[in-house]
């Protein structure tokens, strides 16, 4: 089995026709473009699209599984064919930047795959309750994160999945996200600024490694749906909004240490250069109902990193120094999933 360092040279191929042929034989290699050439992971542990750009459009679907005689069989069929379904769309629309990720909740993993061990940090998310704010815990068995430049392709893939799960799963939540003004959240600031840079190798932060070898190449996926109080937010002067976020609004430059409050969003969520996650957040809205929000989705090789960030946001470090952004943004969901490597996905679907 060739290592990723050997196949990474394919990224340098200039001939577009050859690239398309190679893409057919090397599943998904062009959608996971942030993998470092020195990675120790081999093709056996090839990850799903966990380091991808958030994209122009996204659909997030959380399903709850029904207790039927066909549930395990139908879900396993989705697992077995997931990679092929993705490649089918990618091959037909090579410029659409299509990708999709499948994750499992803790209860679903145990029920669907009773002979499999559980990843070390896969658990039912326990709510985090601070004095002012709560990171709620909500149910979810399957997560589909679908991205593309074309919303029509997201819809096509989602409809295929929904048909395959007919009779064995019910939708808990479906949210459609969109890219806003060059990557800004609806509150007007660039989102994802704190993501690892390419030269930091985002892969090392997003993907499980040798610490849990049976699940190497997988990723812990945590999602929250935040609703923004835009009336309260828009009542703040720009300078005050900048203190809430910790960055200048119009050029995205970080405030100096002298300017930045201790409870600024980027101060509270910074838990160290070695403890990062890969975010792919997207704005969503229902303007006629006055609903505006951010769908937070974070991929991590260690969920403990994500949880530490959440504890600092909702409880504070020290206690009480909570994220001021939470005064304007309220999470109404909170669910943890595990996204296996493509190899493991095929194995559990067998």
Segments the model singles out, each with a brief description of its role:
Residues 1-13, 18-31:
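N-terminal mitochondrial targeting presequence
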Residues 31, 41-350:
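Long, histidine/aromatic-enriched segments associated with O2/redox biology
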């Amino acid at each position: 089995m060739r290592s990723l360092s050997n196949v990474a040279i394919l990224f340098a191929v200039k001939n577009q026709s050859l690239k398309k042929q190679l893409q057919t034989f090397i599943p998904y290699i062009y959608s996971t473009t942030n993998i470092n050439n020195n990675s120790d992971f081999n093709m056996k542990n090839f990850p799903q699209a966990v380091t991808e750009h958030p994209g122009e459009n996204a659909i997030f679907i959380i399903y709850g599984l029904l207790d039927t005689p066909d549930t395990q069989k139908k879900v396993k069929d989705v697992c077995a064919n997931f990679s092929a379904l993705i490649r089918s769309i990618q091959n037909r629309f090579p410029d659409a930047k299509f990708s999709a990720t499948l994750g499992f909740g803790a209860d679903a993993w145990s029920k669907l795959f009773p002979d499999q061990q559980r990843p070390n940090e896969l658990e039912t998310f326990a709510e985090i309750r601070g004095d002012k704010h709560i990171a709620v815990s909500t149910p979810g068995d399957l997560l589909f994160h679908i991205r593309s430049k074309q919303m029509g392709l997201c819809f096509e893939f989602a409809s295929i999945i929904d048909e395959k799960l007919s009779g064995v799963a019910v939708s808990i939540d479906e949210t459609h996200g969109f890219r806003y003004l060059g990557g800004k959240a609806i509150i007007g600031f660039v989102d994802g600024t704190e993501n690892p840079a390419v030269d930091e190798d985002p892969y090392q932060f997003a993907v499980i490694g040798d610490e849990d070898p049976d699940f190497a190449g997988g990723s812990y996926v945590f999602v929250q749906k935040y609703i923004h109080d835009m009336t309260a937010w828009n009542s703040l002067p720009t300078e005050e909004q900048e203190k809430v976020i910790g960055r200048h609004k119009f050029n995205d430059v970080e405030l100096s240490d002298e300017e930045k409050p201790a409870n600024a969003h980027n101060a509270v969520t910074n838990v160290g250069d070695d403890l990062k996650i890969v975010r792919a957040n997207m704005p969503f809205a229902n303007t006629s109902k006055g609903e505006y929000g951010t769908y937070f989705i974070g991929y991590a090789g260690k969920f403990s990193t994500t949880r530490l960030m959440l504890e600092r946001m909702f409880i504070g470090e020290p206690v009480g120094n909570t994220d001021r952004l939470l005064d304007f943004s309220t999470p109404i969901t909170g669910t943890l999933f595990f996204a296996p490597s493509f190899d493991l996905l095929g194995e559990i679907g067998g």
